[in-house]
């Protein structure tokens, strides 16, 4: 998992994935397969992407009783994803069970997929946290607590807003991964996410990986948008024209 850019393949079919990836032929990407695509195409979509040379984040956000999550992770470990995730709200025992399942299911000679925990969705704000979820603690405090719990449970990192990456690193250590969705170019619409930042700011705030979806997948020129992503991540202010 070398590139810090995770491209969210939020498509309903393999055909649309192939169409989007065509301009990137020969360029290994780090891609995210979420519920929409995985539930339509199943494990075969991960196998296809791996055959094309891409790293895969299988974003299914497991949240169930510990034994169910353990058995599910045993199966997912054989699918071939490089990164998987759970909801930290499932608690310590569930997260520990996820690691147990991955350890048990990873084929001999293959590295165990890294496992990260979702702290709070980037569509969650303070009002929703308090009024709908009935969590009385401030959002930042809740995220920090979930991150610490994930680390104590043996996970490799968390999914969090870039705005939360710095204090998570401070609390959990520099090697604890901060994978941040809610990334938009400055001239993009935020859509249904409320805690959004630009690629440049995400790096400055301490993100290890950034998840980028509609800014790339709905771009008129995805290759050019990817080049812009690289350029902005590296501190540039003007759009580049070709990816490196």
Swiss-Prot record:
Metabolic or biological pathway, per its Swiss-Prot or TrEMBL entry: Pyrimidine metabolism; UMP biosynthesis via de novo pathway; UMP from orotate: step 2/2
Name of the protein in its database record: Orotidine 5'-phosphate decarboxylase
Subunit comment: Homodimer.
Any Pfam family: OMPdecase
Segments forming a coiled coil: none
Catalytic activity: orotidine 5'-phosphate + H(+) = UMP + CO2
One Gene Ontology term of the molecular function aspect: orotidine-5'-phosphate decarboxylase activity
InterPro entries membership: Aldolase_TIM, OMPdecase, OMPdecase_AS, OMPdecase_bac, OMPdeCOase_dom, RibuloseP-bd_barrel
Disulfide bonds: none
Active site, per annotation: 61 (proton donor)
Classification via NCBIfam families: PRK00230.1, pyrF
Positions with a binding annotation for substrate: 10, 32, 59-68, 122, 184, 193, 213-214
Signal peptide: none
UniProt-listed PANTHER family: OROTIDINE 5'-PHOSPHATE DECARBOXYLASE
Gene: pyrF
GO cellular component assignments: cytosol
UniProtKB keywords: Decarboxylase, Lyase, Pyrimidine biosynthesis
């Amino acid at each position: 998992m070398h590139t810090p850019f995770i491209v969210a393949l939020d498509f309903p079919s393999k055909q649309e994935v192939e169409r989007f990836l065509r301009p990137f032929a020969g360029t290994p990407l780090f891609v995210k397969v979420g519920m929409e695509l995985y539930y339509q195409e199943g494990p075969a979509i991960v196998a296809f992407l791996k055959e094309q040379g891409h790293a895969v984040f299988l974003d299914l956000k497991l949240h169930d009783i510990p034994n169910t999550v353990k058995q599910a992770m045993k199966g997912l470990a054989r699918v071939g994803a490089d990164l998987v995730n759970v909801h930290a709200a499932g608690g310590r025992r569930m997260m520990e069970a996820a690691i147990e399942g991955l350890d048990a299911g990873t084929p001999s000679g293959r590295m165990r997929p890294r496992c990260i925990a979702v702290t709070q969705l980037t569509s969650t704000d303070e009002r929703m946290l308090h009024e709908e979820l009935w969590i009385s603690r401030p959002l930042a405090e809740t995220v920090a607590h979930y991150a610490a719990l994930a680390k104590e449970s043996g996970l490799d990192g968390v999914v969090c807003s870039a705005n939360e990456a710095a204090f998570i690193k401070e609390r959990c250590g520099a090697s604890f991964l901060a994978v941040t969705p809610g990334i938009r170019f400055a001239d993009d619409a935020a859509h249904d996410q409320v805690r959004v930042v630009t690629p440049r700011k995400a790096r400055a705030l301490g993100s290890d990986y950034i998840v980028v979806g509609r800014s790339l997948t709905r771009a008129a020129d995805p290759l050019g948008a990817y080049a812009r992503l690289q350029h902005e991540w590296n501190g540039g202010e003007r759009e580049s024209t070709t990816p490196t």
